A protein has these predicted regions:
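Glycine-rich beta-strand-centered segment in the early N-terminal region that forms part
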Residues: 21-35, 48-94, 125, 130-133
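Mid-domain Rossmann-like dinucleotide-binding core that forms the NAD(H)/NADP(H) cofactor-binding site
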Residues: 133-212
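Glycine-rich cofactor phosphate-binding loops and adjacent beta1-alpha1 units
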Residues: 154, 181, 197-274, 339-341
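N-terminal Rossmann-fold cofactor-binding loop
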Residues: 189-192, 231, 279-280
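C-terminal hydrophobic helical "lid"/dimerization subdomain
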Residues: 239-242, 283-341
Length: 341
């Protein structure tokens, strides 16, 4: 099978012919139907912080069709279309039993491979897609579930005043879930205006440029925000979120900054800010995302800009690394030879 393999830090992925993986206990082999690119793909191949394992076929926002079952599989069957969490665990520790293999300390393993023709999923951490959902929807489950994890950490109702810093997939996901949870005053902010319409389609009531926040934020929300979601992952933005939030408010850090951050802790202390961080998601987050899509809340489809083949994966990741892309979601369809669709 063909796959994009991480061979060298900071260098293009290598397109290679590698063996089709064989499913072990509780695992299923899936034929990948779609896989999305993510800023994590850049960060974890660049030598900054934690990296993917060298020699791994990467790609973690994937979905596909179950084509083979390993021993002891009881929850999936051949022909199921599934979105799989790109992690595996021991299956028996408290974290795994809670559907959180990301926190497993006994058997955590990365289950990547979405930028390839086949990959493995752990049946305990995979969710079936209903017939009405597309492969595009399936490959959006992972990032939108990640945003849900963060959105659930903040108290949100119809009276909440919400600020979202960053207009990428995480920012769009935060707007999406804030709206679904009843939020009505939702301001998204970023440095440029070109995503304003998209963020409003995702759930934001207003879009402000970053340099306008000081002047216009209170007018847009009525007062300082009760909740701030930091979704950009850019240096300095966590401090900006703490500065913006109301006294007694909540800041949730969804974006991951890999550079050191300088915070004036007395500012957060005097305001009695609740500061939360999120990592990954649970099976419940995956299922809730699939359920929301199945109810017709499919706005995240608008995040996907184009679909490419495996041949273009190395070049596209390098363009992302060099800041040459527009930031919209690009999906990979391993069944096409190349080119845009």
């Amino acid at each position: 099978m063909r796959a994009a393999v991480f061979r060298e830090v900071g260098q293009p992925l290598s397109l290679e012919d590698i063996p089709v993986p064989r499913p072990g206990a509780h695992q299923a082999l899936i034929k990948v139907g779609r896989c999305g690119f993510c800023a994590t793909d850049v960060a974890m191949t660049s030598g900054v912080g934690m990296n993917f394992p060298l020699g791994a076929a990467i790609g973690h926002e994937y979905c596909g069709e179950v084509v083979e079952l390993g021993p002891d599989v009881t929850r999936l069957k051949v022909g199921d279309i599934v979105a799989g969490m790109p992690e595996g665990g021991c299956g028996t520790c408290p974290a795994c039993l809670a559907g959180r293999p990301f926190d497993c300390f006994d058997g955590f393993t990365m289950m990547l491979g979405g930028f390839g023709e086949y990959t493995l999923v752990d049946e305990r951490f995979a969710v079936r897609l209903p017939a009405g959902l597309s492969l595009t929807d399936g490959a959006l489950v992972e990032p939108i579930a990640s945003a849900r994890r963060g959105a659930q950490m903040a108290p949100i109702d119809k009276d909440s005043r919400i600020l979202i810093l960053g207009a990428g997939a995480m920012g769009g996901g935060a707007a999406y879930w804030s709206r679904l949870r009843g939020g009505r005053k939702i301001v998204t902010s970023a440095r440029s205006a070109w995503r304003a319409d998209l963020m409003k389609e995702m759930g934001a009531s207003e879009y402000l440029l970053a340099h306008e926040l000081g002047e216009k934020l209170s007018g847009a929300l009525g007062s300082a925000p009760d909740v701030v979601f930091e979704c950009s992952g850019a240096p300095g933005m966590l401090a900006a979120a703490i500065d913006a939030v109301a006294v007694g408010g909540t800041v949730v850090c969804i974006g991951i900054c890999t550079s050191p951050e300088t915070l004036l802790l007395p500012q957060a202390s005097y305001k009695e800010v609740s500061l939360r961080f999120t990592a990954a998601y649970s099976v419940a987050d995956f299922q809730a995302t699939v359920d929301a899509f199945d109810r017709g809340a499919v706005e995240p489809r608008k995040l996907v800009d184009r679909i490419i083949g495996l041949d273009e994966v190395p070049d596209h990741l390098e363009n992302m690394r060099q800041g040459k892309t527009n930031g919209n979601k690009v999906h990979v369809d391993p069944t096409i030879a190349g080119g845009d669709h």
